[in-house]
């Protein structure tokens, strides 16, 4: 099958800057769909009409987390159980200003423009309405690989406020339009066609989420390593890279992405398998002679130490690790891997022999443009205190552990 040629990100940014609509496609392993996207500041009734007629999906308005706070736009639901956790807020209409039904192309374009107008106040927006704001992650596609973040990133890169307009593109029969048809649509209307994957690559090349702060020698009882501290620019959080040896640019490197676990890594808690996994990974890399352990500041799968202890208390009352997270208002796994991906790129790693039993981790890192050449299993014996925890990771989170007979 002939490879479909996509446009460059630079050309797409220029099109957005000119107020044009473009098509953005995501990964075939995610939704494998395309969206019409433009900058919110450039939306017109004509663009809304075009999107509605040719896209046939749901018109949404991705905006920044800060803007959601300013306009007091709460999330539509407290616990998001959608497949890809699309961050819908309450829907809105602009009140007054010539708006009537809220659904006309004119009314919807006015509502979207109001979302980015600094003079708009929360009371200027009626709830519910006909425009669906989406709350984009602050670091865009480097935090979440979705059209929501792509729209905001493209608007920002084009010099506009971080807000966009998007709609899913459907075929005439109501099914989702896939890449070959999206290419035809792009050609028909002379639109730029890009992928989120290429946008991630562009941002990773032109921007930095992390700063290398300091490196030191780190002799351990499992071997001699180098330790480098990276500061996450947006949050100030510090992440560590424990490094053994050197490698060529395109060489597959053994890597473990390990989330910090005070209870397991430091106190030797038997409630999880984190400490043994960390030490086993160090042994594997020491034996390999080269490799990296990323020690990410993401305690409790990203919910923080205090909330992890609250989750432990719920587990003592009969919940499993997933149920406890959900009851506390978190996802089963709150982590993102964009920061870790950029640290690996800083370390000149693009191909990984990833030490993991977690399929989500493999897919997430691959989504940031890293090539996983091999998933290297890490076998840790269970104990009476963590057996149910490990079973939950296997049965509810898909980890390849405790294989059933």
Swiss-Prot record:
Listed Gene3D superfamilies: DHBP synthase, GTP cyclohydrolase II
Coiled coil location: none
Cofactor (UniProt): Mg(2+); Mn(2+); Zn(2+)
Renumbered residue ranges of the record's region GTP cyclohydrolase II: 206-405
Entry binding sites for Mg(2+) 1: 31
Purpose of the protein: Catalyzes the conversion of D-ribulose 5-phosphate to formate and 3,4-dihydroxy-2-butanone 4-phosphate. Catalyzes the conversion of GTP to 2,5-diamino-6-ribosylamino-4(3H)-pyrimidinone 5'-phosphate (DARP), formate and pyrophosphate.
UniProt protein name: Riboflavin biosynthesis protein RibBA
Organism per entry: Cytophaga hutchinsonii (strain ATCC 33406 / DSM 1761 / CIP 103989 / NBRC 15051 / NCIMB 9469 / D465)
Taxonomy of the source species: Bacteria, Pseudomonadati, Bacteroidota, Cytophagia, Cytophagales
Gene: ribBA
């Amino acid at each position: 099958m002939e490879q479909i040629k996509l446009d460059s990100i630079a050309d797409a940014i220029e099109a957005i800057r000119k107020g044009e609509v473009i098509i953005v496609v995501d990964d075939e392993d995610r939704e494998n769909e395309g969206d019409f996207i433009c900058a919110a500041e450039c939306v017109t009734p004509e663009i809304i009409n075009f999107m509605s007629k040719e896209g046939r999906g749901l018109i949404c308005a991705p905006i920044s987390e800060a803007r959601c706070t300013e306009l007091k736009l709460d999330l539509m639901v407290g616990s998001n159980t959608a497949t890809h956790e699309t961050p819908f807020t309450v829907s809105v209409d602009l009140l007054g200003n010539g708006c009537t039904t809220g659904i006309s192309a004119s009314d919807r374009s006015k509502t979207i423009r109001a979302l980015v107008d600094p003079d708009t106040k929360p009371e200027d927006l009626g709830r519910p309405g006909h425009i669906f704001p989406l709350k984009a992650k602050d670091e865009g596609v480097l935090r979440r690989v979705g059209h929501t973040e792509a729209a905001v990133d493209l608007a920002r890169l084009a010099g506009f406020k971080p807000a966009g307009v998007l709609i899913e593109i459907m075929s005439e029969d109501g099914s989702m339009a896939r890449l070959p048809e999206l290419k035809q649509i792009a050609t028909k209307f002379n639109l730029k066609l890009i992928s989120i994957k290429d946008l991630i690559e562009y941002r990773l090349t032109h921007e930095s989420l992390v700063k290398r702060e300091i490196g030191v020698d780190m002799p351990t009882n499992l071997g001699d390593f180098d330790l480098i501290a990276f500061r996450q620019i947006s949050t100030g959080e510090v992440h560590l890279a424990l490094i053994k040896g050197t490698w060529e640019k395109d060489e597959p490197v053994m890597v473990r992405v390990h989330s910090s676990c005070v209870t397991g890594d430091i106190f030797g808690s038997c409630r999880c398998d984190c400490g043994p996994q960390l030490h086993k990974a160090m042994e594997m890399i020491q034996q390999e002679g080269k490799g990296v352990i990323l020690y990410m500041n993401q305690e409790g799968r990203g919910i923080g130490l205090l909330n992890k202890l609250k989750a432990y208390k719920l587990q003592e009352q009969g919940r499993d690790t997933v149920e406890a997270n959900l009851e506390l208002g978190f996802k089963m796994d709150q982590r993102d891997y964009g920061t870790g991906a950029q640290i690996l790129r800083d370390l000149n790693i693009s191909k990984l022999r990833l030490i993991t039993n977690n399929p989500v981790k493999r897919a997430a890192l691959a989504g940031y443009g890293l090539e996983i050449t091999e998933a290297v299993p890490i076998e840790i014996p269970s104990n009476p205190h963590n057996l149910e925890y490990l079973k939950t990771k296997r049965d509810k989170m898909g980890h390849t552990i405790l294989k059933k007979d």
